[in-house]
Amino acid sequence: MLERLQQLLPPPADPVEPGRPDGWPAVERRLGTPLPTDFKAFTERYGSGTVDDFLYLFNPFVAGEDGNLLVETDRVLAGYRQTRARFPDRLPLPAFPEPGGVLPLGRTDNGDELYWVTEGDPDDWPVALLASRAALQELHRMPVTGFLAALAANHLASRILPHDLLGRPSHQFTPSAEP
C-alpha cells in the first residue's frame, strides 16, 4: 500500500524527523504495543508533515512535544477518557490500552482526531475518525496508508473531512516538524 501512496502522494526528498528502523522497539515498549508496519514504513519514508496542510499524523521521533506520538497519546487519551465518561453514547469505543481501544494517530486543522482501533493484529487496525464539532465518527476498515491513499485518490467517503479536501485534483505532503 505504501507504494501506491507514494505514487499518489509523493514523499519529500528530504523528510523531517523520519526516524530509523532501530528506533521503533523503544517506542513500542513505551506504548506497550507493536505498531502497524505500514505506519512505521510511512514515518521512515515521509517523516513529519501535513497532507494538504490539513491532516497531520503523529510521529514518535518528533523532537518536541507537539505532534510527538508518545506525548500526544497521553494528552489525547486523557481528554478522550474524560469526554467518554461524560458522554459514553458519543464515544462507544474504549481508550487504549483496553482491548479494542482507540490509540491516537493524528489530527486535522479542524481539530478532528484520527485513531487506530486496536483490535487484533496491528497490521489490521482500522482507522477511526472523530469529528471535533459534532457527534460524528467514522470507521475506515483499512490501514493508515490505505486511508491516505484513498484520500489522495479521491476515493475516501467521509462526512467529517471537508469536501474541498476530498475532491482536490491533486494532494501534497509538506514536510514540517510542527503540526
Question: What is the predicted role of each segment?
Answer:
Residues 104, 133-136:
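Short, glycine/charged-rich beta-strand-loop motifs at protein surfaces that mediate ligand recognition
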Residues 110, 121-122:
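Short strand-connecting beta-turns/loops that link adjacent beta-strands
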Residues 113-119:
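Short, surface-exposed beta-strand/loop micro-motifs that present aromatic residues
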Residues 126-132:
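Catalytic Cys-His active-site segments of thiol-dependent hydrolases/isopeptidases
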Residues 101, 123-126:
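A short pocket-lining beta-strand/turn micro-motif at the edge of beta-sheets
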Residues 137-158:
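Compact, glycine/acidic-enriched structural inserts
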Residues 106-107, 118, 131:
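Pocket-edge structural micro-motifs
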Residues 1-110, 160-163, 167, 173-179:
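A surface-exposed partner-binding patch
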